[in-house]
Structure formats: C-alpha cells, structure tokens
Amino acid sequence: MADRTPLPHCKEFDLHTIFQFNMGVQNINRGVVLTGILGVLVSAYTLYVEMAAESRPGYKALCDFAEHASCSRVLTSEFSKAFGLLPKNSAFEVPNCIYGTLFYCIMIFLSTYDNIAVVRLQLLLNAASLITCVYLAYLLIFVLHDFCIVCVSTYVINACLTYLSLKKHSLLNKKQK
C-alpha cells in the first residue's frame, strides 16, 4: 500500500482552506462595495442639502434637528467647500461631498482587485480619509459648535471601509505566507 504522506518540500493542497479564504475576500469586497454605495448615497444627499440651503433661504433639511444639530448650517459653512483650506474661487473649491463621492468610487473600484499592493493603497486612502474625518469632526465640535448627523454618518462609513480594508489585508497576508 502506498504512503500518502506529502513530500516535505510540497505544501498540502487544502481545498477547504482555499475556498474559505476566497469566500472571506469576496464577502469583504461585497462589504466594501455596499459601504461605498452607501457613502455615495449619503454624499449625494449632502450635496442636495448643500445646494438647497444655498439656493433657498430658510430651507430646513430632514437632518436639521435642533439649534445646534443642523446639517444645513454646517453644509453651508466656510468649511463645507475644499475643507475650508483653499481660497475662494479656486478650481478645487468644490463641496467636500464631491471629494467624498470620488473617494467612495475609488474604493469600490479598488475592491475589485485582490492584490496586496492594491489593498495597501486602499489602506493609505483610508488613513487619509480618517485624518480628514478627525479634522472635520474637530471643526464641527470646536469651531462650528454644531452637530451634523450626515457628516457623522460619513465618518462612520469611512471607519467601516478602513476596517474592511484591514480585514482584507490580513487575509491576503495569510495567503502569502
């Protein structure tokens, strides 16, 4: 009877482990796509509120709850375009939600690649988004003294995207070893 012990220099082919890995990465990719779509939808609503508040005096958005919980007031502040960092009439002085939409679309696109280098790029973009979230949250709390549920929603979405990218990175690292 033949010995079925694998050769010492050959790795054992474990279909279950490979299938489990692929399902994990596929589920993470689905999560990134769904979270990214949610980010695009929230950003679209943000743009709607911003444009409506600027064009119609007295406009009250659904996300305006109280005196210090008004997303329309936050979204028409000086920090709502180009993060308040660029001079007026600059080519890049667009609403922050446009940058957010671009970020979410890039994250969705990058999720189609199961490559460690691409996931590292996602992590870099996620780090930039989290730094931006901290900056905007600081402005929201300490400068504007307001609360914006739509803004906070984007912070949560960005944190979820970061978590998913970290999970994918971890899975791809395990695969390489």
Where in this protein do the model-derived segments appear?
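Membrane-interfacial helix-loop segments of redox and metal-homeostasis proteins
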Residues: 3-177
